[in-house]
Every structure is written in C-alpha cells, then in structure tokens.
Amino acid sequence: MLCVLAAMVVLALSALTFNRNVIRDAVDSEKQSAQSQADWEQMLGEEAVPDEEEEPYFDDDGQREISCWGDSMIEGDGADIAFIETPDGVKDISYYTAPYTLQEMTGIRTYNFGVGGAASDEISIRAGGLVLYTDRDVYINNKKATRVALVDGSGNRINMSDYYGYGGEDNDMPDAFYINGYLCTIKPIWNSDEVKLKLYKEPGTKGRQYAFIPRDSEVTPKAAADHSQDIMILEMGSNGGWQSDYDILIMQYLSIIQEHNCSKYIIVGDTDDPGTSLGDINQDVVNDDGSYIGTGETMWETALHDAFGDHFINMRVYMLENGLEDCGFTMTEQDREDYERGIISSQLRSDWTHFNSYGYYAKGKGLYLKGVELGYWE
C-alpha cells in the first residue's frame, strides 16, 4: 500500500513539473515570437506606401498613342538595308519595322512591344490580358529579392524569359510591375519556375522599405498599365501558345481587349504561307478540294475575321495584292506562281517566315490604311 502511495506522489510531482515546463516553454516561445516579430519589423524598415499607376500616355493634343504587341513579326526580325523610289526621290527605309512605318505615316508615337519567339499566351500576359498571380504570402523589400512563383488562374506556374512587356523599347524602369499598387521588379531565375521579387527602389530613396504581398495578388506589367488607353495593334499565334485551337487564341485576344476596355484595335492576320505556320497545325497548303488558297481565307484567317469583323486585317492577302507595288517592285514569273498558291513574294522576305525592310514597310502601310478605314487617324 505504501509503495502505491509513493508511486502516486512521484507521478503527481512529475506531472506538476511537466506542466510548469510546458507553461514556461509557452511563455518563452511567446516572448521569442514577439521578439522575432519586433526584430523582423526592425529588419524590414519603413513600410512602403502603394504607388499610383501613371496616367496612360497621350500626346500634347490629347491623341491616343499606338502600341504594337506581338512576336518577331512586330519586333522586326529580318529588317535590313532598303531603298524605295517615291515621287520625292529615293527614300531610305533601311531597318524599318511595321511599327516604325506606322508611326511615320500617322505622325502618332508608336511603341514596338514585339518580343521574338513569344507565344500567344506570353504576349497576352505582357499586354495585361491573361492575369498572373503570386502563389504565396510574402514580405518584400527594396534591398534584397524574395523568391516567389507566378501562377495563372488555374494555379499553373508560368515561366517566361522576361515578363515586363517593353520588348526592345527604351525604358528607364526595366522589369517593372504593379502588384497590389506597389511598383515592383520581377526577374527570372535561371533553370527555375520561380522569380526574384522586390520593391522598386526609387532614385534617391534611403533606407529599407518593405511591403506585404498576400497570396493571389494580381501582377500587372508596367507597360500594360502605362499603355492601357493606347490604340492597340495585336498580332500573335505564329509561335504557338494556343494549342492550334482558334477559340483559345480568340479568347487570348479578347482578354487584352476587354481588360483595357479597348474599342480601337486592329487584329493582324498571320503572314506565314499557307500550311507553313508552326502555330497552326490545322491548315494545309491546299484547301480540302485540292485547290490552292490563293487570296482566299485560310481557316485561321476565317476564324479571326468572324470573331473580330472589320477590326481584322488579312495581312497575308494585303501583302499578296499590294506588297510589291508598295515598294516599287515588278512581279516576276515566280511571284505570279506564288500568288496563285497564296505565297508572299520572296522579294519581301528575309527568310521563310520573316520580312525584310521592304516587307515590313508594306505591312506598316497596310496597318496605316486599315486605321484610316476604321477612323483611327487620317
């Protein structure tokens, strides 16, 4: 009996000691947590104030500017030395791109946001159509980058060579984005599906600033925010990104147009020869009945024409019917044969898919005339 009582006393004392240790550990943990939070806040520095997005660009007369979004065909890959005859004499169009030609003909500042090799989903992201989100809660500061992943609406991680949208345009704020009103920089991490995120450090800023970015915060490229009110020239799909599903491609176009509530836009048809586009596996070099496409519409062109009506320009057909004349070229026998097949003259190309400066000049003129037709400029 005495042994049992002794054992019970030992157990009681042990329990009391255990409870005291638990309470002490909990108190110590709470103190440590409070201290850690204080240290964290001290380390972070001053809390940043959200930035106001810049007003969209207009010129001195209140004229909307023009932004051209696309891949290498907007960027101007293949542009080279070129001269054309005009009523005023020889004109040097060396290294002209379609956006530059459009700017010259309209007198309106035109931005070239083309990125070589960009797929349609990437172009839509850069233009502010398809929205990206942060995948976790993070504190960020303006001194040291924090890792985070960017995901689409389905939670899939998105990995791009660059996200910010300016392409080859001069820009004194590279890699800039708005996240929850904060101006941030995002840079890819080599061989990773995460990116480096930090607050943009304004010139003259002293000390460390920080901000809390909650999970599922929208990520908006600064280029898309700055140019949300521009007249938009949109060309995409040649490099894939839409699974050769015309409905997906149309949705990507619409995501840009609807996000910016844009009523002034031009959808540019693909200029690869029929059956040669890497993005469209549906189209063959001939129609189902074996006839050549010629100046008729491919399935891709029909899908975009049906979806966007007069906003669509069939650039392949424009180049077939006007490209050589725009540059003062004479049609060769080979050009005539290619015309019947729907193939753009090699005199306008630098390779099988890209134009040279003659081709880009003619393309820019086609965009100019389309804008006149739609009443965007005179």
Regions found by a protein language model. Name each.
Residues 7-20:
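Hydrophobic alpha-helical membrane-insertion segments, chiefly the h-region
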Residues 1-7:
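N-terminal Sec-pathway targeting helices
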Residues 23-64:
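N-terminal, intrinsically disordered, polar/charged segments of Gram-positive cell-envelope systems
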Residues 110-112, 312:
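Conserved beta-strand scaffold positions in the cores of enzyme catalytic domains, especially
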Residues 2, 20, 24, 57, ...:
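Alpha-helical cap/lid subdomain in secreted, periplasmic
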Residues 112-115, 269:
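Residue-level recognition of beta-strand->loop/alpha-helix junctions
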Residues 64-92, 116-120:
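Catalytic nucleophile-elbow at a beta strand-turn-alpha helix junction centered on a G-D-S/GDSL motif
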